[in-house]
Amino acid sequence: MKEFFPVLHTAALFSGISDEELAAMLSCLGARIDTFPKGSRLLRAGESVEEVGLVLAGSALIVQEDIWGNRSILSKTGPGQTFAEVFACAPGAVLNVSVEAESAVTVMFLHIRRVLSVCPSACSYHSRFIRNLLSELAEKNLRLNEKLTHISEH
């Protein structure tokens, strides 16, 4: 996993976290890495998730489909960016979007339950990670709010 540390350090989730802390944190969070070919679905609408996805290489699209099969690309995620964090943080929430590989994509999945509970090892960087997660959620919420404001004006 150390080969991905340069990308992880660009991620808002790991802002202010050293290499040593990062290595310990990835273990604590049950980090796993998967690679998906172009066009494959990483997550499907209708599923529930417990993991945050963080793109390490390649890109993924957040796509919403209506009942007639019309697709809307809501966002694109690239290296250092996350997806599914809102759904993973809300126990029992069901995805209303799918995540698709725009290109071949490598993703690190982090188990959200381990993020939201107190670490049994009392990791000093655990609270920093939670602050980073909240900051990222707030920024995405603000961007969504701006889009809604723009759409409602027309």
Residue map of PLM features:
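Cyclic nucleotide-binding regulatory module and flanking cytosolic helices
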Residues: 1-38, 88-89, 150
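Short, small/polar residue-rich loop motifs at catalytic or cofactor-binding pockets
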Residues: 28-29, 47-49
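Glycine- and acidic-residue-biased ligand/ion/polar-headgroup-sensing regions
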Residues: 39, 50-68, 78-81
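Short phosphate-coordinating micro-motif centered on Lys-Gly-acidic
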Residues: 41-47
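Local beta-strand/beta-hairpin segments that build beta-sheet-rich folds
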Residues: 42, 74-75, 151
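Cyclic-nucleotide recognition modules
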Residues: 73-132
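Polybasic "coupling" helices that flank or enter modular domains
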Residues: 124-154
